[in-house]
């Protein structure tokens, strides 16, 4: 880290919370490709915004068009991908928004580091395992990625030729082959209300 830089203080978290009447947090959606992470993230963001709550979605694919366009899919690059997103999501959470991230984030150690980063800043981190059997994910395969991975066209593909380490104790575990997108978004919303992160809006 450079030594010729200075941290500039601004409004405190509590001051922002009082002004915005909302707590901040990161909702971290993790799971296989085609498990439904992005779809649930979109639905949750819309649900929160419709209730006049501050929320912002960070999507695994979209981020690679800009902030992380220099990264590939090696283990080292995946680590850096999640490190950067952990920092960005923390900034959104610190602004008293609900930061919604939808990333495969296959390695448990990376997700644990993201949690620790938030904990050190006094911010809430909600890990949500978006779970689906591999065969169902392959049947969905909206981008044709599993087919390419099986054919060897895509190397290091999570769930096929690269590992996915499922969460051991996520705050929520959603089976998207058993629940609709709307049901999943509602479950997350109710969790945020019950944990007093947001107030219930009718």
Curated annotation (Swiss-Prot):
Keyword check for Amino-acid biosynthesis: yes
MF GO annotations: adenylylsulfate kinase activity; ATP binding
Pfam families: APS_kinase
Keyword Amino-acid biosynthesis: yes
Residue positions binding ATP: 31-38
Active-site residues from the entry: 105
The reaction(s) this protein catalyses: adenosine 5'-phosphosulfate + ATP = 3'-phosphoadenylyl sulfate + ADP + H(+)
Cited InterPro entries: APS_kinase, P-loop_NTPase
Pathway named in the protein's UniProt entry: Sulfur metabolism; hydrogen sulfide biosynthesis; sulfite from sulfate: step 2/3
EC assignment: 2.7.1.25
GO biological process, one term: hydrogen sulfide biosynthetic process
Alphabetically ordered keywords of this record: Amino-acid biosynthesis, ATP-binding, Cysteine biosynthesis, Kinase, Methionine biosynthesis, Nucleotide-binding, Phosphoprotein, Transferase
Stored SUPFAM superfamilies: P-loop containing nucleoside triphosphate hydrolases
Functional description taken from the UniProt entry: Catalyzes the synthesis of activated sulfate.
Family: Belongs to the APS kinase family.
Protein name as annotated: Adenylyl-sulfate kinase
Organism: Saccharomyces pastorianus
Gene: MET14
């Amino acid at each position: 880290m450079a030594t010729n830089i200075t941290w500039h203080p601004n409004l405190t978290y509590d001051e922002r919370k009082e002004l915005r009447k909302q707590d901040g947090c990161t909702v971290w959606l993790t799971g296989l490709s085609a498990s439904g992470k992005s779809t649930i993230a979109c639905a949750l963001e819309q649900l929160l915004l419709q209730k006049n709550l501050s929320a912002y979605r960070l999507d695994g694919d979209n981020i690679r068009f800009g902030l992380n366009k220099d990264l590939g899919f090696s283990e080292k690059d995946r680590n850096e991908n999640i490190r950067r997103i952990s920092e960005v999501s923390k900034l959104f959470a610190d602004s008293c928004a609900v930061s919604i991230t939808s990333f495969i984030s296959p390695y448990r150690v990376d997700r644990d580091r993201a949690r620790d980063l938030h904990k050190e800043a006094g911010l809430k981190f909600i890990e949500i395992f978006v779970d689906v059997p591999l065969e169902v994910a392959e049947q969905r395969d909206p981008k044709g990625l599993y087919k390419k991975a099986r054919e060897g066209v895509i190397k290091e593909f999570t769930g096929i030729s690269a590992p996915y380490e499922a969460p051991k104790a996520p705050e929520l575990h959603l089976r998207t082959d058993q629940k609709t997108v709307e049901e999943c978004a509602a479950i997350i919303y109710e969790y945020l209300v019950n944990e007093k992160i947001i107030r219930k809006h009718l």
